[in-house]
A protein has these predicted regions:
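Hydrophobic alpha-helical transmembrane segments of membrane proteins
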Residues: 1-79, 90-265
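Short helix-to-coil transition segments within interhelical loops
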Residues: 85-89
């Protein structure tokens, strides 16, 4: 059933993303092959990059709006009556929104990479990329941690949005769920920032004389990446585990409010 829900979500959102993807690719292609000869082409050299920047800005705005709007309208408004009568678990409803948003976010990232390639393909050095890939793939654990941290950070943002909207609708924080969700989102972010700052401060105060901590600090201050890598692995692993913990909290919070505190209009 999750597959059917995701298929429905992808169809409902594709009409917004695909035209922008096409526009970005076309603009990037023409920017990549442009020349500076003639007044008309010189004018295009100014117009095309501006249009591309505006397209990327539009893509970012649409992504944000759809993340909020699809969850709000589809689950927390009148459409929610239909969605919650379907023979599916609440987790499937949450997952369909989450996975679909992830697909479009990573799709947008790939479009950005393709756009940069189309724009600068004449200036790329094969040897530079070959060496870069060799260095990157020589540290598979580091690469995996970076990838997982990227995914979990995006998931963290999405689940925090969902949890904020769930809390806002359950307790009628404001007449507008979006406004209420924004207030809750900022409140949650502030709370975790304060907690994180306190933990870092107390950790520095209590463990500043610890030899292991001092060795890690020295490694991170090194100018040679090979010296930094061991400490960086540990640091990123801790950050990854902490991000996963927050994701679990936000997921449980979202599920609880959809199951027990749903207040449909």
């Amino acid at each position: 059933m999750l597959g059917k829900l995701m298929k429905y979500e992808l169809k409902a959102t594709a009409r917004y993303f695909l035209p922008l993807y096409a526009a970005i690719i076309v603009l990037s292609f023409f920017i990549g092959i442009r020349t500076y000869e003639g007044p008309f082409l010189s004018l295009l050299n100014g117009i095309l990059p501006t249009a591309l920047v505006l397209s990327f800005m539009g893509l970012a705005v649409i992504t944000m709006i759809l993340v909020v709007n699809r969850f709000d309208k589809n689950l927390l408004s009148d459409e929610g009556y239909l969605m919650f009568t379907l023979p599916v678990k609440t987790t499937s409803l949450i997952n369909s929104k989450l996975f679909t948003s992830l697909i479009w976010i990573f799709g947008s990232f790939l479009i950005f990479i393709l756009s940069m390639f189309l724009i600068g393909w004449r200036y790329f050095e094969v040897d530079f990329f070959r060496e870069s890939f060799r260095v990157i793939f020589s540290e598979p654990y580091f690469l995996i941690i970076i990838f997982l941290l990227l995914v979990m950070t995006i998931v963290n943002f999405l689940l925090q949005v969902y949890a904020s909207l769930g809390v806002a609708q359950a307790y009628s924080v404001t007449k507008s769920r979006i406004l209420g969700g924004t207030i809750i989102f900022v409140g949650i972010a502030t709370f975790f920032n304060v907690i994180e700052s306190l933990v870092v401060f107390l950790g520095t105060l209590l463990f500043r004389d610890n030899q292991w901590i001092q060795d890690m600090a020295l490694q991170l201050e090194s100018d040679y990446f090979g010296d930094i890598l061991p400490a960086l692995r540990i640091l990123l692993t801790v950050v990854l585990l902490y991000t996963i913990l927050k994701n679990v909290i936000f997921y449980v919070l979202t599920k609880y409010h959809l199951n027990k505190k749903l207040n449909l209009e």
